[in-house]
Amino acid sequence: SALAINQPNYSVLKELGLNED
């Protein structure tokens, strides 16, 4: 999600595969 991209731990979410475009 766009909100996740704004989070400082976005890279962590990306690692976990939780980031949604």
From Swiss-Prot:
It is an enzyme of class 1 (oxidoreductase). Optimum pH is 9-10. Its EC number is 1.2.1.31. It catalyses: (S)-2-amino-6-oxohexanoate + NADP(+) + H2O = L-2-aminoadipate + NADPH + 2 H(+); (S)-2-amino-6-oxohexanoate + NAD(+) + H2O = L-2-aminoadipate + NADH + 2 H(+). Disulfide bonds: none annotated. The keyword Oxidoreductase applies. Keywords: NAD, Oxidoreductase. Transmembrane segments: none annotated. GO terms for molecular function: L-aminoadipate-semialdehyde dehydrogenase activity. Homotetramer. Belongs to the aldehyde dehydrogenase family. This is Alpha-aminoadipic semialdehyde dehydrogenase. It comes from Ctenopharyngodon idella.
